[in-house]
């Protein structure tokens, strides 16, 4: 076999530019993204995109053997950008020839194609950022590219090794996720290979997958033949949803369960496919996502690629069978897992696969089709097909296959009972098999149910478990704090709830409160004896004492923690830190060894142990150990620092800097460890040698100097912040910033940390100090405004603060947007809001979301022509899940201008505008969803036809206007029917003479409004996508009231109750003058009353 080749090169790829990172912190406490919290802190977001395309150079790393060739882009999250099947001369993963980001990612920019690795949540926060990488050669001729990062949102580390072996036609992916924190964390892992969509695509799910779930298991469908309603699509006729062409709307589905280790996709057009193989006990997740085979999906295809067409996301979950589905990672725990991605050909739909082979056994009109595809050499193997329960084989052939080759055949003229196919190795061991699956008429599994609200819980056990779920899944609308606090309200000494609260308080740097909760937990744990099974409360209290410099108390609790198995490793590590701080290196080495016996993968302890060997003069032992550690952890920046520190060679310095590439997280991790080990002088030396010129490392470096010597570093830290926006999120960063009391920007960053952790009083104190020290700093005033509105509900105070901010930064489009948003949420008149935006029109037009507000304000103030100009010329970039904001204004604009022509007795011109409203212009970057009934457009088309004397066309249009769903949802999303559609349905029914049906519809609307107005509403527990980047929050209950009023208003109009209509409209307008389609109804309702009633 030819050895695997690996090389690095710069590749030029056509690339669309993004806008700059937003320098403002985003506190998104209510944002929902992919079914969990859409919070973006500590990152800066990028929410503006460009149509400018340039040929950009990217760092690429290639792997190639005789069968496949793979390109990895470390500068784009370490994704596999291209995977080429050399045998079939095809991309076995969808290849996008351009880098064309759309607003799909957690932080904004996201690109399609290749294989993305989504962790620690979906989509990967750093999917559009550089990560670390290095290369490793193996003695057998294999090559590995390691990519990874320390991710600052959750404080976890990942290493992923991409390996090609000389004798294997598969990409082997070995990953390690590590938690280097003192408290547990949570992560998800969904590898996300894209495959070619189109008419020829078919997903290859295992034969035992008979049901699939939606996100959060909130809905379920039969599979592969769907027979019910799924994603609002009627599949009752029986539709094969494994085919791309049969799924018309954006749709996710995830296998309920499977006992097989594979999932894949087949392209009928290319006679080739992709398979993923992994242990299903570790990797149960099998998912398909598509944008939908429709105008809607095609619009997203155009937003993501120039010429490569539609794609499917074939996702594979590790420790996860659904999204969101996070798994726990204990303090200092490491999880390892392997996955294989491989091309295959010839066999089509297959029934089982392993890391060595793929088998097919399928009945068709031709007979019994069988096949075998080799991933690795199959020498001396046998393939047998038998009827279960019978001895004689229908097929029993010797097999000799090289990788990437296949054999197949057909058994004719027989119709046996259940069959099995078996592949055996040279020793007769069955290595892969499949028994024909016999479908059974089983009921669909139940969908998930939302848990009780915290105040309704009566059991501490239930309170703790729900709190754990919310914490684990990063739930967007409910807080685990509420459930743990409910638990301690029921039982003040409940061990688990107090322990959970202690850990949460520790994570947000409230160490005294962490001690208090841990002490409460220990009152129960130590009530009968001092040696409980669980030592976690002692461990977290010790860590909290240590953070406060109370080392004697910390030592006592660390010793108590080592008595218990689940806290022994952490306890000995704590003792090792204290020993190192005191210069007692021999004791520190012993404690490290004790800790490693309990947890041998704790990279913190491994690094400390190696450093203590160096400091105690045992350099030879340190070097031997470090060589092994660097083979195990080739991306650990602290190990590479140790490699330089031990010898101070220029080559070692270049290696260390080459790995870190100036990324702040690497500098912060190593410096933070050294500070925690009581070695601030080494930390300062390390930061000086690495020379990372980003804000937080510069602050950390400054904090280690005397106050009189750090002015230059502090000034530089402030100056470079906009170049790479990152806010503090670790305890070491907080401690450093708190020590630099003379810096106003450090006060701001501390306020950001505490506000994000929901320690609002601390945050406000820091922002107030910030603006006292630097009253010209806009973001300090913005922070105070956010708190004033969201937490104090004080419009006047928030407005004054935001006015200060915008006056200080009049070119800042986000500040203008938020000032307008504040007016919108407080019910300001359209005229007042429009005056502000038009006075700053150039700034307002910098943002799509603010432009959408402008469009609505122009409509409300009778200036539809101004809105039409923008809608005809501006290129918009919607967020995934936030579609409809601009297209709704486009439809409204067409309706308003059509009405103007109707009112001027120009029905033909009106008809043309209405017809155009049925198709969105390409510059809006959105397509229509199938099933969109457009009742308003068809109603007015009928009015136009009637005005032109075409009663046949009028009736046809009325029939269309009268169709559609007649339900009203409490929560509304982009794919939900607007509530006013029901009104137009009822109006159409009236004009068709179906008065009784219309009367019933309007009566049901009125009843719904009356009943729901009495209902208290809460956020949708299973919401999947609410992507708006809004730091100022609306009142959910008021929004519900507005919806009820609008439904009541339209119901009254439909029933001819003019007084009730006017009353509801006045009340609605008083609380929200910009209610949906107010411009239309205010204009046309006199005509409606005259025409219909």
From Swiss-Prot:
One Gene Ontology MF term: carbohydrate binding
Alphabetized PROSITE patterns for the sequence: TPR_REGION
Signal peptide: none
Origin: domain of life: Bacteria
Pfam families named in the record: DUF5107, TPR_16
InterPro entries registered for this protein in UniProt: DUF5107, GH-type_carb-bd, TPR-like_helical_dom_sf, TPR_rpt
Name of the protein in its database record: Uncharacterized protein YphG
Species name: Escherichia coli (strain K12)
Gene: yphG
């Amino acid at each position: 076999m030819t050895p695997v080749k690996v090389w690095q090169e710069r590749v030029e790829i056509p690339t669309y530019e993004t806008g700059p990172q937003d320098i403002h912190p985003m506190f998104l406490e209510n944002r929902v993204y992919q079914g969990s919290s859409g919070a973006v802190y500590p990152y800066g977001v990028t929410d503006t995109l460009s149509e400018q395309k340039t040929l950009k150079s990217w760092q690429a790393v290639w792997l190639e053997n005789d069968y496949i060739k793979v390109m990895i882009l470390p500068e784009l999250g370490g994704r596999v950008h291209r995977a080429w099947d050399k045998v079939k001369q095809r991309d076995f993963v969808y290849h996008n020839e351009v880098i064309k980001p759309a607003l799909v990612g957690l932080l904004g920019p996201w690109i399609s194609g290749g294989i993305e690795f989504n962790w620690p949540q979906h989509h990967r926060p750093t999917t559009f950022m550089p990560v670390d990488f290095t290369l490793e050669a193996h003695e057998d001729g294999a090559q590995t590219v390691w990519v990874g990062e320390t991710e600052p949102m959750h404080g976890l580390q990942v290493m992923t090794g991409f390996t090609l072996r000389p004798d294997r036609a598969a990409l082997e992916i070995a990953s390690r996720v590590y938690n280097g924190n003192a408290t547990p964390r949570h992560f998800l892992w969904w590898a996300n290979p894209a495959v070619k969509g189109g008419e020829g695509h078919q997903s290859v799910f295992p034969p035992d997958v008979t049901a699939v779930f939606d996100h959060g298991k909130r809905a379920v469908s039969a599979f592969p033949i769907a027979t019910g309603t799924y994603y609002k699509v009627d599949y009752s006729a029986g539709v094969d949803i494994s085919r791309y062409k049969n799924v018309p709307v954006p749709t996710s589905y995830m296998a309920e369960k499977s006992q097989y280790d594979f999932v894949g996709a087949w392209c009928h057009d290319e006679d080739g496919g992709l398979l993923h193989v992994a242990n299903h006990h570790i990797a149960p997740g099998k998912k398909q996502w598509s944008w939908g085979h429709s105008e809607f999906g095609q619009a997203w295809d155009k937003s993501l690629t120039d010429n490569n067409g539609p794609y499917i996301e074939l996702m594979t979950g590790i420790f996860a069978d659904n999204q969101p589905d996070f798994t726990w990672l204990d303090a200092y725990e490491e999880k390892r897992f392997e996955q294989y991605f491989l091309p295959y050909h010839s066999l089509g739909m297959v029934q089982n696969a392993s890391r060595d082979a793929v088998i097919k056994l399928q009945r068709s009109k031709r007979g019994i089709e069988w096949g075998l595809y080799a991933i690795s050499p199959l020498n001396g193997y046998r393939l047998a097909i038998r009827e279960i329960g019978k001895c004689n084989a229908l097929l029993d052939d010797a097999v000799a296959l090289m990788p990437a080759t296949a054999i197949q055949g057909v058994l004719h003229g027989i119709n046996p009972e259940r069959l099995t196919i078996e592949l055996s190795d040279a020793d007769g061991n069955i290595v892969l098999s499949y028994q024909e699956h016999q479908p059974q008429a089983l009921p669909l599994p139940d969908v998930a149910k939302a848990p009780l609200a915290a105040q309704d819980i009566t059991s501490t056990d239930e309170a703790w478990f729900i709190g754990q779920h919310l914490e684990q899944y990063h739930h967007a609308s409910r807080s685990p704090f509420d459930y743990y606090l409910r638990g301690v309200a029921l039982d003040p000494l409940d061990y688990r709830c107090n322990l959970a609260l202690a850990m949460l308080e520790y994570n947000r740097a409230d160490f005294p409160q962490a001690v208090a909760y841990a002490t409460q937990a220990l009152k129960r744990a130590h009530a009968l004896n001092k040696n409980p099974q669980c030592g976690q409360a002692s461990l977290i209290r010790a860590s909290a004492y240590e953070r406060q410099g109370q080392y004697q108390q910390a030592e006592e609790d660390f010793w108590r923690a080592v008595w218990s198995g689940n806290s022994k490793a952490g306890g000995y590590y704590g003792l090792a830190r204290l020993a190192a701080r005191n210069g007692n290196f021999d004791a520190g080495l012993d404690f490290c060894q004790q800790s490693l016996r309990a947890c041998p993968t704790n990279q913190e302890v491994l690094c400390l142990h190696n450093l203590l060997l160096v400091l105690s003069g045992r350099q030879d032992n340190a070097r031997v150990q470090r060589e092994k550690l660097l083979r195990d952890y080739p991306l650990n920046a602290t190990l590479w620092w140790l490699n330089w520190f031990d010898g101070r060679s220029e080559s070692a310095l270049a290696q260390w800097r080459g790995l870190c590439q100036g990324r702040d997280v690497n500098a912060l991790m190593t410096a933070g460890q050294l500070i925690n080990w009581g070695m601030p002088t080494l930390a300062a030396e390390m930061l000086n040698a690495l020379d990372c010129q980003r804000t937080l490392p510069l602050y950390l470096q400054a904090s280690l100097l005397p106050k009189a010597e750090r002015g230059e570093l502090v000034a530089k830290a402030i100056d470079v912040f906009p170049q790479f926006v990152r806010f503090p999120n670790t305890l070491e960063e907080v401690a450093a910033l708190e020590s630099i009391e003379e810096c106003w920007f450090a006060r701001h960053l501390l306020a950001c940390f505490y506000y994000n952790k929901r320690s609002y009083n601390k945050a406000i104190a820091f922002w107030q100090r910030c603006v006292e020290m630097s009253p010209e700093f806009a973001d300090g005033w913005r922070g105070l405004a956010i708190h004033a509105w969201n937490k104090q509900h004080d419009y006047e105070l928030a407005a004054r603060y935001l006015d200060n901010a915008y006056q200080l930064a009049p070119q800042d489009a986000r500040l203008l947007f938020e000032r307008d948003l504040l007016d919108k949420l407080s019910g300001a008149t359209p005229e007042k809001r429009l005056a502000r935006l038009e006075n700053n029109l150039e700034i307002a037009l910098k943002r799509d979301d603010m432009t959408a507000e402008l469009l609505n304000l122009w409509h409300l103030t009778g200036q539809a022509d101004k809105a039409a100009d923008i809608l005809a010329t501006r290129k918009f970039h919607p967020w995934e899940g936030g579609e409809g904001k601009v297209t709704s204004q486009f439809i409204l604009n067409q309706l308003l201008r059509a009405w103007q022509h109707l009112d001027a007795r120009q029905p033909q011109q009106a008809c043309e505008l209405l017809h155009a409203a049925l198709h969105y212009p390409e510059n809006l970057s959105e397509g229509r969803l199938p099933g969109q009934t457009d009742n308003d457009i068809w109603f007015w088309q009928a009015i136009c036809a009637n005005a032109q004397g075409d009663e046949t066309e009028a009736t046809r249009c009325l029939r269309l206007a009268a169709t559609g769903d007649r339900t009203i949802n409490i929560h509304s999303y982009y794919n939900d029917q607007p509530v006013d559609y029901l009104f137009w349905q009822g109006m159409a029914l009236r004009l068709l003479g179906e008065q009784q049906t219309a009367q019933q519809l309007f009566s049901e609307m009125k009843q719904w409004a009356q009943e729901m107005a009495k209902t208290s509403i809460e956020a949708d527990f299973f919401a999947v996508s609410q992507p708006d980047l809004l730091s100022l929050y609306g009142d959910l209950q008021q929004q519900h009231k507005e919806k009820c009023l609008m439904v009541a208003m339209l119901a009254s109009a439909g029933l001819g109750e003019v007084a009730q209509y006017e009353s509801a409209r006045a009340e609605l307008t008083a609380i929200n003058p910009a209610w949906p389609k107010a411009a239309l109804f205010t204009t046309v309702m006199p005509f409606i009353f005259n025409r219909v009633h």
